[in-house]
Regions:
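Fold-level recognition of mixed alpha/beta catalytic cores in primary-metabolism enzymes, strongest
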Residues: 114, 119-234, 241, 266-270, ...
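Acidic/His- and Gly-rich active-site-bordering loop/insert found
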Residues: 2-115, 138-143
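Generic non-transmembrane alpha-helical segments
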Residues: 10, 21-24, 28, 43, ...
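Short, solvent-exposed beta-strand/turn "edge" segments of beta-rich domains on protein surfaces
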Residues: 192, 265, 282-287, 334
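Histidine-centered divalent metal-coordination motifs
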Residues: 85-87, 209, 388
């Protein structure tokens, strides 16, 4: 019997425990903010200890522990890193009014789906990494090289205490390739992602009585006009690298299938979202202050200097406005035809009868941090059903499929 058949048989025999672990993981609430993931990290530790797996806590911030562990094969070879995060989006105290059909930290199973905050983003994917680490330890005499598990905190806020800290301070986590289980849909594999630029704009005017509009400009109207000008960024030309353009054209249907109709259209474009806006004190006053936050997504191939120059030219037209840069994560990508991409495609074909398509992610993941170090990083995860909203859930079949795909692909990578 081949090792890959043995891996699948082991997963089939242990699937009840694999599902139960994800339920327990979801029940260990780890919203960020505030970001305390200690209870959830203990759930992971308990499972790893039960299977006698090597691991350690790396906690540069006491309430945001990271879990790192490595196993070696029978001889030197390639080094694969598994990466997932422990923290999840927060939930409102009034969750029942938001339409949740079950408490968000319940991990309850309804119609063969596991419900709860973090079920798709990304406790399903992180669980797949953990089980892959456990499973491959049983076959370490049959593979070469090294397998490293990284379960991190502080991802949801792009914070400094998770993957960013590990990559800067723990050489063990770098490796030759990274595999991540962030939600991507079974139909797509992410080899890159758009970057992000977060800006805060503040507008100040003299203000006045609401009937005396001749005495002062309205800060809210100035902000509105500025936002309209910023929309022009979406029309900027982007020179997508040729090999990526080919991959994007081939994957358009699968991209829309996994991420919603229109996803393929905006992937190669700059997009603007005004996430928050605040201004004015009273209906019959001309506002003297208004502020808003802009979320600009940057496609692979965009010229950052061109983006910043365009923003500067726009802002110059509005002397009442000032701007502050809050965050910049450049876009990232690796080879859309790389070794791990081919391995993932082949295993999904064998398991599900179709080949997922390579795509660039619309949102941000920690996989970018490995790409910034010129280490290929690929993302294959569940469909993002309810991600960040009510009734987040993952079908049990999709979860088990992910465990199988990651375990088989890790084995293939380390035996190639």
């Amino acid at each position: 019997m081949s090792a890959k058949i043995e891996i699948l048989n082991w997963i089939e025999n242990e699937k009840h425990k694999i599902v139960l672990f994800l339920q327990e993981f979801i029940q260990a609430a780890s919203p960020n903010p505030p970001g305390d993931t200690t209870i959830a990290a203990k759930v992971i530790s308990k499972l790893l200890e039960k299977h006698k797996m090597p691991f350690r806590w790396v906690s540069p911030q006491k309430t945001m522990p990271n879990i790192v562990g490595s196993i070696n094969g029978s001889k030197p070879g390639r080094h694969l890193v598994l990466n997932g995060h422990i923290d999840v989006f927060p939930v409102s105290d009034n969750y029942s009014e938001e339409g949740w059909i079950t408490p968000p930290w319940s991990g309850e199973i309804i119609e063969d789906k596991i419900y709860g905050r973090g079920s798709t983003d990304m406790k399903c994917g992180t669980s797949a990494s953990i089980w892959t680490y456990i499973i491959l330890n049983k076959f370490k005499t049959k593979f070469s090289g090294k397998l490293t598990l990284t379960c991190v905190s502080d991802e949801e806020t792009f914070g400094p205490w998770g993957s960013r800290w590990l990559i800067d301070n723990e050489p063990e986590v770098l490796g030759d390739c990274c595999l991540n289980g962030e939600p991507s849909s079974p139909f797509t594999i992410r080899y890159g992602e758009k970057g992000l630029l977060w800006l805060t704009f503040k507008v100040q005017t003299d203000g006045s009585h609401g009937a005396y509009t001749h005495l002062s400009k309205s800060a809210t109207l100035v902000a509105t006009n500025l936002i309209q000008e910023l929309k022009s960024l979406e029309a900027l030309d982007v020179e997508v690298p040729h090999e990526l353009l080919k991959a994007q054209e081939k994957s358009a249907t699968a991209f829309d299938q996994g991420m919603g109709v229109g996803a393929a259209n905006i992937a190669p474009k700059v997009t603007l979202n005004i996430g928050t806006i605040s201004g004015g004190l009273k209906n019959n006053m001309v506002p003297s202050e208004c502020s808003f936050e802009a979320d600009i997504r940057l496609p692979v191939g965009c010229n950052l200097d061109k983006i910043f120059n365009s923003i500067a030219e726009i802002t110059k037209k509005f002397p009442e406005a000032s701007m502050e840069q809050n965050m910049l994560n450049p876009p990232s990508h690796c080879n859309p035809d790389g070794d791990m991409m081919q391995i993932l495609k082949s295993n999904v074909q064998d398991l599900r009868g179709f080949q997922p398509e390579p795509v660039v992610s619309l949102g941000g993941t920690d996989a970018r941090l490995w790409r910034y170090k010129n280490i290929p990083a690929y993302v294959y995860g569940p469909t993002p059903t309810g991600m960040g909203s009510a009734n987040e859930n993952v079908p049990i079949d999709d979860y088990l499929h992910l465990v199988k795909t990651h375990a088989l692909s890790a084995y293939d990578y380390l035996t190639n």
